[in-house]
Amino acid sequence: MIYRITKYDPTLRDAEGRYLPWTWTSYSDIGRAVNGCALCPAAYLETERRYTDALICILQALHVDALRVKELEPPVRSSAVLQNDFAEKGLSLSAAQADFLRRVADISEISVPDFEVCFQLQLRECFWCRLVDPQGRAAVWFGYDYYMYVACKEIPAALVRKICAGGLYVEAQTTKGSWLNQNIT
């Protein structure tokens, strides 16, 4: 099963699945008007935290303690360039994030201590990759417009309720014949 996890209420989609209200879709929207108010760094960071917390809880529930880095897409922008980009938006690049960026091109697998930083940097569009559990229990990736995907057999219902109570939406996607039905490792 592939789960799409987003901040977007599925009841506000049209028949083709497009989200109808205009909203922010990237950290680059910080400072732009969203429904009459400028998106501030604090609101962005709160949403980013909800995404990373949800994903970490899912991986814990699935007993995933490592993820292989697959399909890493360059370019990975330099820490100096990102620091300037983030500063313009009222964000910063932490020492842990800068360290991860220096190492990402050479990393084949990440462990729990790197999960949060890796997810934050992908949400901030610093790089893209698919992350796959070596045991085949899950795969994770981020899409355009602040979409997050988890492929796994099942996210426990209680955890789905907890994530939804935290302001995110978990939608099961049925994709017959997808790569998920093959070997995801």
Regions found by a protein language model. Give the residues of each.
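Structured alpha/beta or helical-core interaction and ligand-binding surfaces enriched in interleaved
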Residues: 1-147, 151-185
